[in-house]
Amino acid sequence: MRAVIPYKKAGAKSRLSPVLSLEEREEFVELMLNQVIDSLRGAGIEKIDILSPSVYGLEDMTKARVLLDEDDLNEALNRYLAGSEEPVLIVMADLPLLAPAHIKGISSTEKDVCIVPGKGGGTNALFIKNPSRYRVKYYGSSFLTHCSIATDTGQNFEIYDSFLAGTDIDEPEDLVELLIHGKGPAKEYISRKFRLEVSRGRVGLVLL
């Protein structure tokens, strides 16, 4: 099997712009990417590809193979799947709470496809045993779409339900979960800029 991580550093994570500058966001996404790669390697996955529209931020990448594709996410991933002859694990790059144990659980499924739901109907990871028979369709309620694609193509699927694997970092409030549950460079980076504060029974961020 092999893993592929879609990644784009330039202008990353615009929804974090209320709390992080462009430079900070680009530094942060690079840290998250490297943590995802380390988790994959910790789970015993050696074949790791980064699928990106640009080499920006990947010039010195040695932990994974960089594949350039300027098409949109779905076209690039579907081209990748069509050319794959072994099981593929698609993992998003913004999952700093993802651990090797999650990856082992996802990839050990007995089903044809394993789908990891993200917040708001998204898809954080997809393990596909027969990639040439499957097509992805991200954006919108992609979790439901990916379940339907599996059914429509005659493939059974498992839903891997995990709070940590299901927590992608897109919004400022997601940084709260990273500070509470995370560890490693991504958490350390955010903890140098923010601390947690409880107000009116809710946990929020306060700038240091």
From Swiss-Prot:
HAMAP family reported for this sequence: CofC
Subunit structure and binding partners: Homodimer.
Keyword Nucleotide-binding set for record: yes
Described purpose of this protein according to its UniProt entry: Guanylyltransferase that catalyzes the activation of (2S)-2-phospholactate (2-PL) as (2S)-lactyl-2-diphospho-5'-guanosine, via the condensation of 2-PL with GTP. It is involved in the biosynthesis of coenzyme F420, a hydride carrier cofactor.
Pathway listed: Cofactor biosynthesis; coenzyme F420 biosynthesis
Disulfide bridge positions per record: none
Pfam families per the UniProt record, alphabetical: CofC (PF01983)
Taxonomy of the source species: Archaea, Methanobacteriati, Methanobacteriota, Stenosarchaea group, Methanomicrobia
Species whose genome carries this gene: Methanosarcina acetivorans (strain ATCC 35395 / DSM 2834 / JCM 12185 / C2A)
Keyword Metal-binding: no
Homology family: Belongs to the CofC family.
This enzyme's EC code(s): 2.7.7.68
Protein name as annotated: 2-phospho-L-lactate guanylyltransferase
